[in-house]
């Protein structure tokens, strides 16, 4: 994963710089990159991406046609990835681009794992508390993980807050052993 991220980062940065400060252009690139990422993950196409007998131009043509309206700059980007034999990294390019975009727009993606489904009001209170703590806009992604027993685990970037019963029991067990 680290290698994929390392290879994808320069492409994502280049696209991000190309989009500039224009919110409409940033959104357009998000759409383009997502479309290309989706296409290259189709199993029938994924096997062709590294096939030595298929030219970069052929690959670019297939991906551009399948991805739909990418515009001239989007198609040029696909050709660049294809000529460098990096089309298989398109999903990672899209992911890194979205990270750069979120950072520039002052948004942090927060993953919330809870033992039970959070109600809308709980999600709103949690988002507000995280906004205050992190000093940025928060984009919540919630999932249910019954193995937590109760409570929740929150991940925002490099920060993890474990308020789950499972986590508390693990810390208690560790304290008793030591």
Curated annotation (Swiss-Prot):
GO cellular component terms, A-Z: plasma membrane; proton-transporting ATP synthase complex
Keyword GTP-binding: no
Pfam family membership, one: OSCP
Keyword Acyltransferase: no
Membrane-crossing segments per the record: none
Mode of membrane association: Peripheral membrane protein
Molecular function, one GO term: proton-transporting ATP synthase activity, rotational mechanism
Compartments reported by the entry: Cell inner membrane
Major subcellular site: membrane
PROSITE patterns: ATPASE_DELTA
Keywords: ATP synthesis, Cell inner membrane, Cell membrane, CF(1), Hydrogen ion transport, Ion transport, Membrane, Transport
NCBIfam families tied to this protein: ATP_synt_delta, PRK05758.2-2
Quaternary context: F-type ATPases have 2 components, F(1) - the catalytic core - and F(0) - the membrane proton channel. F(1) has five subunits: alpha(3), beta(3), gamma(1), delta(1), epsilon(1). F(0) has three main subunits: a(1), b(2) and c(10-14). The alpha and beta chains form an alternating ring which encloses part of the gamma chain. F(1) is attached to F(0) by a central stalk formed by the gamma and epsilon chains, while a peripheral stalk is formed by the delta and b chains.
Role description: F(1)F(0) ATP synthase produces ATP from ADP in the presence of a proton or sodium gradient. F-type ATPases consist of two structural domains, F(1) containing the extramembraneous catalytic core and F(0) containing the membrane proton channel, linked together by a central stalk and a peripheral stalk. During catalysis, ATP synthesis in the catalytic domain of F(1) is coupled via a rotary mechanism of the central stalk subunits to proton translocation. This protein is part of the stalk that links CF(0) to CF(1). It either transmits conformational changes from CF(0) to CF(1) or is implicated in proton conduction.
UniProt family annotation: Belongs to the ATPase delta chain family.
Protein name: ATP synthase subunit delta
Species whose genome carries this gene: Halorhodospira halophila (strain DSM 244 / SL1)
Encoding gene per record: atpH
């Amino acid at each position: 994963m680290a290698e994929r991220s390392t290879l994808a980062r320069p492409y994502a940065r280049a696209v991000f710089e190309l989009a500039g400060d224009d919110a409409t252009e940033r959104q357009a690139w998000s759409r383009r990159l997502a479309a290309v990422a989706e296409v290259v993950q189709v199993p029938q196409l994924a096997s062709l991406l590294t096939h030595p007998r298929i030219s970069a131009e052929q690959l670019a043509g297939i991906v551009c046609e399948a991805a739909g309206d990418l515009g001239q700059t989007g198609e040029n980007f696909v050709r660049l990835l294809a000529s460098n034999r990096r089309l298989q990294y398109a999903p990672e390019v899209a992911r890194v681009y979205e990270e750069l975009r979120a950072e520039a727009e002052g948004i942090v993606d927060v993953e919330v794992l809870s033992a039970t489904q959070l109600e809308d009001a709980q999600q709103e209170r949690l988002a507000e508390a995280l906004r205050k703590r992190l000093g940025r806009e928060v984009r919540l992604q919630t999932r249910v993980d019954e193995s937590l027993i109760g409570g929740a685990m929150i991940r925002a970037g490099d920060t993890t807050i474990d308020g789950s019963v499972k986590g508390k029991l693990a810390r208690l067990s560790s304290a008793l052993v030591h």
